[in-house]
């Protein structure tokens, strides 16, 4: 029996308040309106950015259905949708691509002006949410809301992917993998034979390492205070691993001494202001490129001496690895299917959706790289 055009009752993980666990609720998901797509979710990754909402570091209206790293199958579409059809395998896009704004038309930029990321409204483009629970509207989260058995997204925030792709793996392309991998191959444009330093060895940091290796870097130095992460970093391409706590001097000085004045490319994948500075200083003063990948704390500012850039350093950042999402996600899935990069080593746990709070405990304790929740 078709559910198209009807309200669907399903389970979702609702965050009602900051610093509280998720609650599995029975919610109602209204049909998609014009230029919207309703998706039956199959799998979703648990990302640090979701936890930033729980802690208040990333501000979005509550109550909300979080989650932004998922994959599923189109259940129905609203009027005017031409990019996908019911039955298509898709990845929702937290970084949309309208194709019409100045940024989408820019050949190098990818942060669509219709993105809900900088100042989250908690709604779709139309101005409301399709979620309700106990008679109350539940907000969306950055165009996606993948912590629900069904979600509704705008058609500018969904990409059709290979129908043979395993959704419990390629869901990582919806955020963490693409963010890290693209930071190396597209944002920094790592060159063959170069030396790289990667600060932070979570799922995104390890994806940076995969990107550096794919780009032909000769040395990839992994930096983390958790030595338990070193084996996985080396498995994925790190040539050396160092712990800042093992040294009496600042880690940037250690890296400068190891690399004849500094690395060619550095990546901060933690989201701390002090490590952003360390990553910048660890790259060569005259030719180094440092990329900010980690999401910094809300409303905190970083001060620095302009002389650090005057000799030729470059300091840059990007959302979603610099990829134009609708264009790039299908290609990244195709590359995965062609075995151009691995995803399996990033997935340390697979849990049923109902165990979402256990997944966040694993994330906060540092015991997981990526936990995938299946519906």
UniProtKB/Swiss-Prot annotation:
PROSITE patterns: ADH_ZINC. Keywords: Acetylation, Cytoplasm, Metal-binding, NAD, Oxidoreductase, Zinc. The keyword NAD applies. It catalyses: a primary alcohol + NAD(+) = an aldehyde + NADH + H(+); a secondary alcohol + NAD(+) = a ketone + NADH + H(+). The modification N-acetylserine is found at residue 2. Expressed at high levels in the liver, small intestine and eye, at moderate levels in kidney, ovary and uterus, and at low levels in the spinal cord, thymus, heart, stomach mucosa, skin and testis. NAD(+) binds at residues 200-205, 224, 229, 293-295, 370. It comes from the Eukaryota. Zn(2+) 1 binds at residues 47, 68, 175. Binds 2 Zn(2+) ions per subunit. The keyword NAD applies. Belongs to the zinc-containing alcohol dehydrogenase family. Class-I subfamily. This is Alcohol dehydrogenase 1. It comes from Mus musculus (Mouse).
């Amino acid at each position: 029996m078709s559910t198209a055009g009807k309200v669907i009752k399903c389970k979702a993980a609702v965050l009602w308040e900051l610093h509280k666990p998720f609650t599995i609720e029975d919610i109602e998901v209204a049909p998609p309106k014009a230029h919207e797509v309703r998706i039956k979710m199959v799998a979703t990754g648990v990302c640090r950015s979701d936890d930033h909402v729980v802690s208040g570091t990333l501000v979005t209206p509550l109550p909300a259905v979080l989650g932004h790293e998922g994959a599923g199958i189109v259940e129905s579409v609203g009027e005017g949708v031409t990019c996908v059809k019911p039955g298509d395998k898709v990845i929702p896009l937290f970084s949309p691509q309208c194709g019409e704004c100045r940024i989408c038309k820019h050949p190098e930029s990818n942060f669509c002006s219709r993105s809900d990321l900088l100042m989250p409204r908690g709604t779709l483009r139309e101005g409301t949410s399709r979620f309700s629970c106990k008679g109350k509207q539940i907000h969306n989260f950055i165009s996606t809301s993948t912590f629900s058995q069904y979600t509704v997204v705008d058609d500018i925030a969904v990409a059709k992917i290979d129908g043979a792709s395993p959704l419990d793996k390629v869901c990582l392309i919806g955020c963490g993998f693409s963010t890290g991998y693209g930071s190396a191959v597209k944002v920094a444009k790592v060159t063959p034979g170069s030396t790289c330093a990667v600060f932070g060895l979570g799922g995104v940091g390890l994806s940076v390492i995969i990107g550096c290796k794919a780009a032909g870097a000769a040395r990839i130095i992994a930096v983390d205070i958790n030595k338990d992460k070193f084996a996985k970093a080396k498995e994925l391409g790190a040539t050396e691993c160092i712990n800042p706590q093992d040294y009496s001097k600042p880690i940037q000085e250690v890296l400068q001494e190891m690399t004849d004045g500094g690395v060619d490319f550095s990546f901060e994948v933690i989201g701390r202001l002090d490590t952003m500075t360390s990553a910048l200083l660890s790259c060569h003063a005259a030719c180094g490129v440092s990329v900010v990948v980690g999401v910094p704390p809300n409303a905190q500012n970083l001060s620095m001496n302009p002389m650090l850039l005057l000799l030729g350093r470059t300091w840059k950042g990007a959302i979603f690895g610099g990829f134009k999402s609708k264009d790039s996600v299908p290609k990244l899935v195709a590359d995965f299917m062609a075995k151009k990069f691995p995803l399996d080593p990033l997935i340390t746990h697979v849990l049923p959706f109902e165990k979402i709070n256990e997944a966040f405990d694993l994330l906060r304790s540092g015991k997981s790289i990526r936990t995938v929740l299946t519906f």
